[in-house]
Amino acid sequence: MEPAVLAAHHLPHHEPISFGIDQILSGPEPPGGGLGPGQSGQSHGESAAFSSGFHGASGYAPAGSLASLPRGSGVGPGGVIRVPAHRPLPVPPPSGAAPAVPGPSGLGGAGGLAGLTFPWMDSGRRFAKDRLTAALSPFSGTRRIGHPYQNRTPPKRKKPRTSFSRSQVLELERRFLRQKYLASAERAALAKALRMTDAQVKTWFQNRRTKWRRQTAEEREAERHRAGRLLLHLQQDALPRPLRPPLPPDPLCLHNSSLFALQNLQPWAEDNKVASVSGLASVV
């Protein structure tokens, strides 16, 4: 059966009202939005009857009634309940208790009003939680995925470079010139003599051999370049130089001994000079 029908059966009998619609329309408007005490009482009585009838039919009684509400719980004069702008969210029942069936007005007793939550309360809590998370995010250990500076592994801290005294370096260099590789016993004896550890002597000799190999390779490369340049210079010197072809003998010089001797003394003379000499000989 419908709840409205059940509520209609359980409506109590009220006294007839002392005024009608004509009196309301003709008379002045009473304060409180046009609702008189009789109308407020009637609506309150109908809602109470509806709530009691509904709960009676369902077999469940609410935790409290309107009569048990305190004065500061939003109940106005005449039993009118002040409903907030936002409809409250239903409070989940405790574990082990029977599920509460909300009434038509959506309000319970004083205990229900104390545990009501509104949407603006949840938004405020979420806002405070977000602000707290944002404030603690720089100090949290979690790293953002995809950030290049936070995903890369931190660089390893380099060990401080060991510095040796001048006397130790001179003795090590002198020993290296004589012997490039040391046996374990020789290395231990040298480390003890120089007041160094075996690992320090071993590392120094390894680094010195690497440097020696690099210097030897560079020196060999320089010698190879010098030898190539020297060979190229020798080849250029060994090549025969092109000789100037001899000048054809002048027929006048063949018959004149002085001109012939002059031509032989100047083999570098050009053709024009030879021609000039020939002209002079003809003049003589």
From Swiss-Prot:
Residues folding into a coiled coil are none
Alphabetical UniProt keywords: Activator, Developmental protein, DNA-binding, Homeobox, Nucleus, Transcription, Transcription regulation
UniProt xrefs under Pfam families: Homeodomain
The Pro residues compositionally biased stretches are 87-96
List the InterPro entries.
HD, HD_metazoa, Homeobox_CS, Homeodomain-like_sf, TLX1/2/3
| Chief location | nucleus
Q: What happens when the gene is disrupted?
A: Mice are born at the expected Mendelian ratio and show no visible phenotype at birth. After weaning, about 43% of the mice exhibit distended abdomens and growth retardation, the others remain symptomless. About 36% of the mice die between 3 and 6 weeks after birth. Affected mice display distended proximal colons and cecums. Both affected and asymptotic mice have increased numbers of myenteric neurons in ganglia in the proximal and distal colon with a concomitant increase in myenteric ganglion size.
Q: Which domain of life is it from?
A: Eukaryota
Q: Where is the composition biased (Low complexity)?
A: 40-52
Q: Which GO terms describe its biological process?
A: enteric nervous system development; mesoderm formation; negative regulation of dendrite morphogenesis; regulation of transcription by RNA polymerase II
Name under which the protein is recorded = T-cell leukemia homeobox protein 2
